[in-house]
Amino acid sequence: MNGDLNSWDKFCNYLWFDKKLNIWLDISKINFTSKEINNLEDKFVDVFSSMKELENGAISNIDENRQVGHYWLRNPSISPSSKIAEEIRADINAISEFGKQILNGDIKNKNNKQYTDVLWIGIGGSGLGPLLITESLQKCSRGLNFSYIDNVDPFLISEKLEELSEKLSTTLFVVVSKSGGTPEPRIAMEIIKSHCEKNSLEWNSNAIAITMKDSKLFKKATSEYWLKIFNLQDWVGGRTSITSSVGLLPLALINENISEFIKGASLMDEATRISDFKNNPAALLSSAWYLTGDGTGKRDMVVLPYRDRLQVFSKYLQQLVMESLGKKFNRNGEVVNQGISVFGNKGSTDQHAYVQQLRDGIDNFFCIFIELLDTPSTNIFDDKENPKEYLSGFLQGTRSALSSENRQSITITLEKLNCFSLGALIALFERAVSFYAELVNINAYDQPGVEAGKKAAANIIEYQQKVSNLLDAGGEYSINDITSLFDNSVSESIFFILREMCFGNDNYLVKGDWSNPNSLVIQKLNS
């Protein structure tokens, strides 16, 4: 056995298939030898042991002193207490029942009209997970129509409100925030709530919260008598929340099968729990990442699903992989700067874009092809060229063209895309990320870089208020004048704040040239 990317023996030896899941995994086009992958088996003894401890309830998110329990969501019986198991089952039943009541009209708005739409407010995994669910699984004219606000872009918020203007009274407003303190969903929520109140539209009776018990959002939703509150456990992280209420509520509201989604994830969890290294798909997948990047993440992951419905999956993996694996320090406190960069879109579209560079340019990546074998049950393709055959041909052709230049790839094949297979696919990558983190000795479940960004943003927001108050009080100020009052190290930030606040705003008199920040003198005019 050698690293030959086109070896039939290697393909046969490392092809994984599970007949319960009907999923194939092929890592043969990763450049490794049998000796190299066999050397990882000893490492996986500790990897499997660590995963067992995590599932048994060990504190795995050290920074926040929290357990990591998304695996319990798919199989409550493995959770560390009967109380947790009962809560998980109760949450699933509550969401399933609520979805049925909304869709069949048992729950209507204050005007006795059936709900038609959902405006989903959440950021990170709280937005990407639901978006993946609806984009991948929602069928035409089935369930409620979904719109998303996953940012505080003022144009996004105004456009969504305009799009829904005639249907806001029959729109469910779902706000997702575990703590209730995340600025982006809080700000979007307040803007939309205010808009509804100004236009004599219902907010409270149309609003749903997904949050932790006793969080700021929980208390707000309770005191204002929102329509519903669903639980988001403190041991569920945003990037692994798709099998919690965050992912199950969208499934219920588009009339898809929650049980099948959970079953697919649970069966993949079983397949990735076994200690037989070469028959564990997540062990094979994470080993391929490790070997192709020399354990340092030196190759980017390019995700190419050959099905439009999975286009969001690339973005979903971008967060799951990069937020979990992008770490400065390992568990020993040593600087390692780990991580795998992820990008992608869909095939065959990308064959007419960056695949040119993948084949002929810098060799700093590996591809993950995702293939589906099913065809729509329709007669529109009778006696015509079958697009499925062309799509498959484009995938195989791209894979072959890359390997001919020794460019590496992994191929995952699903029989069909449905709730069951999507749940399984997500669970496969969740476990592979965990395994890879163990291989390189980092914590996959903290996010100090994200927290640092939040703190820095909070500082800027504080400076914005200080600058606004200063200008409101009257007088002319240069950037140097302002920084001398606050902090001489933030001149660049003050420039950005003034530009955002004053450029093109007739309420401010600006002297000087914006291309020369030191020349600027700014005064607020009397209104």
UniProtKB/Swiss-Prot annotation:
Q: Which domain of life is it from?
A: Bacteria
Q: What is its EC number?
A: 5.3.1.9
Q: Where in the cell is it found?
A: Cytoplasm
Q: Name one GO biological process term.
A: gluconeogenesis
Keyword Glycosyltransferase recorded: no
The entry's active site is: E323, H352, K454
Q: Which EC main class describes this enzyme?
A: isomerase
Molecular function in Gene Ontology: carbohydrate derivative binding; glucose-6-phosphate isomerase activity; monosaccharide binding
Show the GO cellular component annotation of the record. Answer: cytosol
InterPro entries found in the cross-reference section = G6P_Isomerase (IPR001672), Phosphoglucose_isomerase_CS (IPR018189), SIS_dom_sf (IPR046348), SIS_PGI_1 (IPR035476), SIS_PGI_2 (IPR035482)
Catalyzed chemical reaction(s): alpha-D-glucose 6-phosphate = beta-D-fructose 6-phosphate
Specify where it is mainly localized. cytoplasm
Belongs to which family?
Belongs to the GPI family.
Entries under NCBIfam families matching the protein: PRK14096.1
The protein's job, in short, is:
Catalyzes the reversible isomerization of glucose-6-phosphate to fructose-6-phosphate.
HAMAP family named among the record's database cross-references:
G6P_isomerase (MF_00473)
Protein name, UniProt field: Glucose-6-phosphate isomerase
> Which source organism does the UniProt entry give?
Prochlorococcus marinus (strain MIT 9301)
Q: What is the lineage of its organism?
A: Bacteria, Bacillati, Cyanobacteriota, Cyanophyceae, Synechococcales
Q: What gene does the UniProt entry assign to this protein?
A: pgi
